[in-house]
């Protein structure tokens, strides 16, 4: 098979391959960029594999960076965008179930391709567009199938993260997982516990955003893989999430965790511990702690609660849509947001300095307490947000405290 017209992303990198070949080495486009081109999907990073060893690549080009030289990868910056060039290699045992104990550089493309995870990722292409498919990846693409290269159990034992990658590709592409590969998922699933949580989380987030996430999660439930994920989530919760994802999927990564935790049978005081078990970012933690309590009782949410999460309202509505909250309820929440007289405490027309300047309070806890009461009074429309009204009301509050 030959691609007659190469996408621009590959044409821009052709001079790199030509230069390597002119020195007597082999060079090919490999990996996800080739796969995505064949699937008519957007192409991201273009990777190159070569028979030249790292030091030979560095001698051929003037601008290089050792991005992963111990594994044979050198970044070449000679032609515009940087391109990662990796030497053909074979790999030894994987004691940590993630990285090979030893990498051996070789001159054979076939040896390099057979160490890869799935057949759809083990396709190479020459600079002129000739496709090299040694493991029937094209057939698997045509039949919409995720199949491991060689023995699936061996592949998953080498790198247990490939279990999550199989599920993720299935969720993104809508491909079925081949029977032998699916059986290996269940057999080797326990090795997920040996993988860094951060790496699992990245794949899991991509999975949930996939158009076919529901089908992929169903496979994970059937293979009993969910028991090896952080947080010990109940099967009933997984089934609820699977049903949600048949209708809609998160369109942005920021929605994932507020949505996900809104569907779990967790008490509010357990949210933070759960998020820590997944090693999420502080921003994700803040979003969850702000949004999930609202979602849990959205029918009775107060104006104060919505005011407190004003900056998260777009995220809140995305979560409410994902879980199928009635439109009437969402409209009521939006009306409360829209009717807020202020959206942040910085919108208040007076500050603590004004209270001090007018000799209404003295520095200390009382000032903060009065400012909070003023803020609440404005939100409830007891008073208007005007300096004269606020100062007058502040005097009343102080007098009431004295009495």
Swiss-Prot record:
Catalytic activity: a tRNA precursor + 2 CTP + ATP = a tRNA with a 3' CCA end + 3 diphosphate; a tRNA with a 3' CCA end + 2 CTP + ATP = a tRNA with a 3' CCACCA end + 3 diphosphate
Keyword Nucleotidyltransferase (UniProt): yes
Record keyword tRNA processing present: yes
EC id: 2.7.7.72
Lineage top rank: taxon: Bacteria
One Pfam family named in its UniProt record: tRNA_NucTran2_2
Keyword annotations: ATP-binding, Magnesium, Metal-binding, Nucleotide-binding, Nucleotidyltransferase, RNA repair, RNA-binding, Transferase, tRNA processing
Molecular-function annotations in GO: ATP binding; CCA tRNA nucleotidyltransferase activity; magnesium ion binding; tRNA binding
Binding locations of CTP: 32, 35, 116, 159, 162, 165, 168
Names of the cofactor(s): Mg(2+)
Amino acids binding Mg(2+): 45, 47
Positions of ATP binding: 32, 35, 116, 159, 162, 165, 168
EC main group: transferase
GO biological process terms held by the UniProt record: RNA repair; tRNA 3'-terminal CCA addition
UniProt cross-references to SUPFAM superfamilies, sorted A to Z: Nucleotidyltransferase, Poly A polymerase C-terminal region-like
Coiled coil start-end: none
Function: Catalyzes the addition and repair of the essential 3'-terminal CCA sequence in tRNAs without using a nucleic acid template. Adds these three nucleotides in the order of C, C, and A to the tRNA nucleotide-73, using CTP and ATP as substrates and producing inorganic pyrophosphate. tRNA 3'-terminal CCA addition is required both for tRNA processing and repair. Also involved in tRNA surveillance by mediating tandem CCA addition to generate a CCACCA at the 3' terminus of unstable tRNAs. While stable tRNAs receive only 3'-terminal CCA, unstable tRNAs are marked with CCACCA and rapidly degraded.
More details: A single active site specifically recognizes both ATP and CTP and is responsible for their addition.
Family membership: Belongs to the tRNA nucleotidyltransferase/poly(A) polymerase family. Bacterial CCA-adding enzyme type 3 subfamily.
Oligomeric and partner information: Homodimer.
NCBIfam families: PRK13299.1
Record protein name field: CCA-adding enzyme
């Amino acid at each position: 098979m030959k691609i007659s017209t190469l996408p621009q992303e590959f044409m821009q990198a052709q001079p790199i391959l030509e230069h390597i070949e002119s020195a007597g080495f082999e060079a090919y486009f490999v990996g996800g960029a080739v796969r995505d081109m064949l699937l008519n999907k957007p192409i991201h990073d273009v990777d190159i594999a070569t028979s030249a060893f790292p030091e030979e690549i560095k001698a051929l080009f003037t601008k290089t960076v050792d991005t992963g030289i111990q594994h044979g990868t050198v970044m070449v910056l000679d032609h515009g965008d940087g391109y990662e060039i990796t030497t053909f290699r074979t790999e030894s045992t994987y004691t940590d179930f993630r990285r090979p104990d030893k990498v051996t550089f070789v001159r054979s493309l076939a040896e390099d391709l057979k160490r890869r995870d799935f057949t759809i990722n083990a396709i190479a292409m020459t600079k002129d567009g000739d496709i090299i498919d040694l493991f029937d990846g094209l057939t698997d693409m045509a039949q919409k199938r995720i199949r491991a290269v060689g023995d699936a159990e061996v592949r998953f034992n080498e790198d247990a993260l490939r279990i999550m990658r199989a599920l993720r590709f299935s969720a993104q592409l809508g491909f079925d997982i081949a029977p032998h590969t699916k059986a290996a998922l269940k057999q080797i699933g326990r090795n997920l516990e040996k993988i860094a949580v951060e790496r699992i989380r990245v794949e899991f987030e991509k999975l949930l955003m996939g158009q076919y996430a529901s089908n992929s999660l169903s496979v994970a439930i059937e293979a009993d893989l969910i028991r090896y994920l952080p947080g010990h989530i109940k099967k009933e919760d997984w089934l609820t999430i699977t049903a949600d994802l048949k209708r809609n999927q998160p369109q942005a990564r920021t929605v994932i965790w507020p949505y996900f935790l809104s569907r779990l049978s967790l008490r509010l005081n357990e949210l933070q511990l759960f998020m820590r078990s997944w090693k999420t970012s502080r921003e994700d933690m803040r979003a969850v702690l702000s949004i999930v309590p609202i979602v849990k009782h959205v029918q009775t949410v107060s104006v104060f609660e919505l005011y407190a999460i004003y900056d998260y309202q777009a995220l809140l509505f995305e979560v409410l849509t994902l879980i199928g909250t009635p439109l009437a309820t969402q409209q009521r929440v939006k009306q409360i947001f829209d009717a807020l007289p202020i959206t942040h405490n910085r919108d208040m027309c007076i500050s603590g300095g004004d209270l001090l300047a007018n000799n209404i309070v003295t520095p200390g806890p009382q000032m903060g307490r009065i400012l909070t009461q003023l803020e609440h009074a404005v939100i409830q429309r007891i008073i208007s947000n005007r300096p004269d009204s606020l100062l007058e009301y502040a005097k009343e509050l102080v007098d009431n405290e004295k009495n």
